[in-house]
Amino acid sequence: MGIVVIGAVFVDIKGYPLSTYIPGGRNAGRVEQVHGGVCRNVAEDIANVELRPTFVSLVDDTGSGQDVIDKLAKHKVNTKYIEKVPDGMGTWLAVFDNNGDVCAAISKRPDTTPLTRLLEEKGDEIFADCDGIAFELDLEKDTVKQILRCAKKYNKKVYAAISNMSIAMERRAFLQEIDCFVCNQQEAGLLFSDEYDHMAPEEMCRTLAANVHSANIPCMVVTMGGEGAVYARSNGESGVVPAKKVDVIDTTGAGDAFFAGTVIGLTYGKTLPEACEIGSRLAASVICTAENVCPRFRPLEFGLNIPVVD
């Protein structure tokens, strides 16, 4: 059944300045609207590596919601478990500076409580034959509990990302039950109540290794933008993954692509450093385009001997 991805759908509204960006001032520019959401992007990224994920989510009961389903289905994502409900999609509004980085953002989260009922009713058929599970840690607590319960029942690996760290902090205890957790440097600082922005990769790696050991977190990967990423396991394994050197067009979705690549690697037999390397390549492919998902790849390009199913 492939990798099961569980999370919210957002509509991303992105503003780009046409000339030098003036904080607090009026800026002429262009505005784009695209389908987004961490796990929606992750599902499409996995599908773009010619794997066939299943996306469990909610969309609005409108034409916009149907558009999301249609686009994912076109990319060969299994959309059987996407339900249409009122207020099923969130909105993410972001303004970018001249370097392609987000300088201001506001998000309105959707109501994801119906996911708990969906997993209660159909959890067995969703998870029994899947290859692995990827989800957003900032879903409702009952939803997270349901995912972890099913993962334990069917002995499936579970991987988590986040879109809102303040909400995810309330789920911190669940990290001990997750096979690998991926976040960025700023989010890691919030998670461990510390300041990491000044740290170089080597220092960040040592700090992360100490933190995952003391917090009993099985495995964690922290992305550091242009400086790459660091990883650490509670058993002492740790390392640095350098970033790929590319021209930055738009950083939206790069973290999601990194997470997708890491999940793909860990699910299909790669070591943690090899999985992070796949994540780094997918992230680079997103950064150098205006899209928020990666272009098409084949599994063999990442050393994955998985048949492509059409």
Q: Which residues does each PLM region occupy?
A:
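A glycine-rich helix N-cap at a beta->alpha junction
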Residues: 71-86
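Conserved phosphate-binding/catalytic region of the ribokinase-like
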Residues: 3, 198-310
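Conserved phosphate/ATP/ADP-binding segment of small-molecule kinases
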Residues: 148, 152-157, 162-238
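Glycine-rich phosphate/adenosyl-contacting loop at the front of the ribokinase-like
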Residues: 1-70, 74, 92
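Short glycine/proline- and charge-enriched loop/turn segments
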Residues: 20-28, 184, 239-243
